[in-house]
């Protein structure tokens, strides 16, 4: 690898687009403006991305604020909706539902945490569910939404929210943002990775058309392929499937509901669970399941039988392996998103894990 004598990072190369790649590109363009010579992102239109409807958690606000993105512009571009909570259905008993809300639940009393007080009273007084004391959960249950009130005395000041949005549209939105700020997009399929003979660092990547893209630091956003960290550098994979056996998913869009719910729905099935993510223009649905305990046909039957609105297409199958690379940073390659690992997004944390990785990396510059 050719690198300046002071070891400064001048050429940053991002391999792969999608949500992870364009989040990295947009954040780097914003934070490293003037600090690096060139930011290049390589992607191929011939290689698809996993992109489905995405649900997030509240720290996504921090990422948008970092980029200086206006909320309404973001929602319009991504067909986004508001999210106050996750509703879990059938996870305890069949027919049982409960909310995992964002924000505060109740109020601490005389140094006693509210959930401890609630637990004590429940055993003695028969008080209602914990979610009854969360403004976010009560609003979500009633299909209502409001932005938090700035007045701390208002009950609405306890509202905390995140978003649902179309992942493909989100990547396109961030792509335009990044390119406007100087990121160079290169269209092409990577067919070769050149390693430095002495250090073992990645010195360049070769494209199908013969072009060679050199760099000082490479960000692997190539998805499950893990083209640089896994394939080129040989970093091993810690398989977690003995703990988390789900290894398949089916995804299908359906029509938008007349009443857009301000929450993500997670519905437990016999060998997995089903998500429902409401967007402006459609509803994202999917069934994550363990193929050792359920076959494809049964998984698809359950998914389609539990759609709330008519399907807009065919089921798309996905295969995955739960786990993480032994190292997410090896030599001059850092992996983000699926290139580094995968955990089924039961708590809507996929994008948050990307965001956290980006923040930790950029803090080192």
List the predicted regions and their residue ranges:
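FAD/FMN-dependent oxidoreductases across multiple families
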Residues: 280, 289-365
